[in-house]
């Protein structure tokens, strides 16, 4: 029997038991589902038989799912109020449980053609109390709930086990295949650490790899080989050159091995690997000079070197043909856009070249007004080039630049009429039209009366009229009133 069918049957039994409890407790039930006492006892008996049979079937099913085959029948799953199957089951439907399946054996009926009396019937008749019936039904419902929960738990566990088993079988290869893959990968790992001569000996034996190789091989990079086994060097990748400083590798003689140190970044460069013959070293030198010549524009800014390093390299380069200047990135105190080679210049000219930190100090001084820009230096043309420094200076100095332009105007322009910039010349026509309209509008107004031609009296005459003929003046020789000089006598 399938687990789904067992679960459905157990749920049906639970519904019937709940209906029986509702009738025994005289709860509200529709008229069609009401049962009398005899029907209740008979239904209780039938449900006990059916539940016992389903419990046994479920125990065998759970044992099969968990891959446990019990040799004995689980008596704990049988209800307490149900007698043994040999006593309660009719002879015609007697069932025998063998391991994980149920075989039904029909016994011949008795000669009289009647069934044996069931002991369960006597038990029910001897104890017809409804209280006992209700308790037994409640216990049966609890057992059914327990069986349902156990069935759901086991089914979910079996599903999860099958899911994990399928994932493992898909991802993990068999042990034999893993062993073969590991054995096949060993020659490949050994060949990475072999010299060229040893690889040529083993080249006849080819290693075959399986097509469906599911193992991920993580191999560490090969360690540096001894100098005698290396015939050349590889070109560094562009991404590595842009991210960090790469050592400048040059072929040297068999007896010479030089090490150069970067003073600015305190990074030790790799040992120089000698070439096998002189002809191979010359060919490699020409090829590397051609490869580096087109890429110094992007990597010159990140691969600067000090002057002391250039001096040590110039000594080691004396026994080799000259290389292109672009093939080696050298430190210059000027920014990366300058292409001058300061190592070729005499000592006096190198002293006059402004250092990088000094140039930064001058620019910061120009921004914060404690240092003035001197135009006699050779870098006075920096303002013409667009740069972030010039934009930053323009934000700080835009007001001062306008004042300096006003000071440079000629004297005739400043003393004459006020002049405006070319960009503020608009608006003359509009002003002319507004003046004409205003004149036309006020021309119709009544004009003021013309003033009389009579001469205006002076203020001192008005004072004489108001004060009755004269003004009291202290005794002085001469008093100036208005525009005339009056000589006063003592009689006044």
From Swiss-Prot:
Keywords: Developmental protein, Fertilization
Tissue specificity as recorded in UniProt: Mostly expressed in pollen and open flowers and, to a lower extent, in closed flowers.
Residue ranges, compositional bias (Low complexity): 287-305
BP GO terms, sorted: double fertilization forming a zygote and endosperm; pollen development
Composition skew (Polar residues), residue ranges: 317-336
Superkingdom of source: Eukaryota
Region ranges (Disordered): 218-354, 394-426
Sequence ranges of Acidic residues compositional bias: 256-270
Observed phenotype of the null mutant: Altered male gametophytic development with frequent single-fertilization events leading to reduced seed set due to undeveloped ovules. Increased levels of ARI14 in sperm.
Compositionally skewed regions (Basic and acidic residues) per UniProt: 337-348, 403-412
Function recorded in the entry: Positively regulates reproductive function by facilitating male gametophyte formation and double fertilization.
Note: Transcripts of KPL and ARI14, encoded by adjacent genes organized in a reverse orientation, have the potential to generate natural cis-antisense siRNAs (cis-nat-siRNAs) pair targeting ARI14 in sperm, thus leading to opposite expression levels during male gametophyte development.
Official protein name in the record: Protein KOKOPELLI
Origin species: Arabidopsis thaliana
